[in-house]
């Protein structure tokens, strides 16, 4: 609030704002799953990779929805919420925590898939290969200018190219790994 309105608010005022936001969130109709999301999760699983979700939310109903909708690909141990980090997106902390929860992976061992500018910035700041999915009304530059490595307009487009990207990534890694 200080940044946006130039004024401080009390903890009580902040809690009231949060409660109103939560009430609005819960009164909204349930959003449909974007086409291609379950397919990309299956492809990630088939590639021997771990699916994780990084969200700026800490809303328990959202976490339960994720587990309900994507439980065959995801478990709660691999969800990063606002409560897991001190600094949220666009800072790298949420994605670095995601790497930690996935088994202490290095940034080059992960892939960020994001549809929001702050998330793209966070993935890039964490030095993780970042794919932007511009599934909304933003100009492409709102995502590409934040540093995304690739940009698609639908998850289904990314899904179609996923296996080829993984093959290329593995070949590149093998070519750049020094022989010991």
Residue locations for each model-derived region?
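Generic secondary-structure transition motif, activating predominantly at the C-termini of alpha-helices
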Residues: 5, 22-25, 29, 45, ...
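Short glycine/serine/threonine/alanine-rich loop segments
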Residues: 7, 49, 128
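Short, acidic loop-to-helix structural element flanking the phosphoryl-transfer center
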Residues: 26-53
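Short, mixed-charge, low-aromatic patches
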Residues: 1, 17-23, 50-58, 117-118
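A metal-dependent, Asp-based hydrolase signature
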Residues: 1-25, 35, 43
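Asp-based, Mg2+/Mn2+-dependent phosphohydrolase catalytic module
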Residues: 12, 38, 42, 58-180
């Amino acid at each position: 609030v200080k940044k946006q309105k130039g004024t401080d608010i009390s903890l009580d005022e902040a809690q009231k704002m949060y409660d109103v936001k939560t009430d609005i969130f819960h009164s909204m109709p349930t959003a449909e799953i974007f086409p291609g999301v379950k397919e990309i999760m299956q492809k990630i699983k088939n590639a021997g990779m771990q699916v994780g979700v990084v969200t700026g939310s800490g809303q328990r109903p959202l976490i339960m929805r994720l587990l309900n909708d994507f439980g065959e690909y995801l478990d709660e141990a691999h969800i990063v919420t606002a409560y897991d980090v001190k600094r949220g997106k666009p800072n790298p902390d949420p994605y670095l925590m995601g790497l930690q929860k996935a088994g202490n992976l290095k940034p080059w061992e992960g892939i960020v898939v994001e549809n929001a500018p702050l998330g793209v910035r966070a993935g890039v700041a964490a030095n993780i290969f970042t794919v932007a999915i511009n599934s909304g009304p933003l100009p492409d530059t709102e995502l590409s200018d934040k540093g995304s490595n690739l940009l698609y307009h639908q998850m289904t487009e990314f899904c179609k190219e996923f296996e080829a990207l993984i093959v290329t990534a593995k070949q590149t890694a093998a070519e750049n790994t020094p022989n010991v």
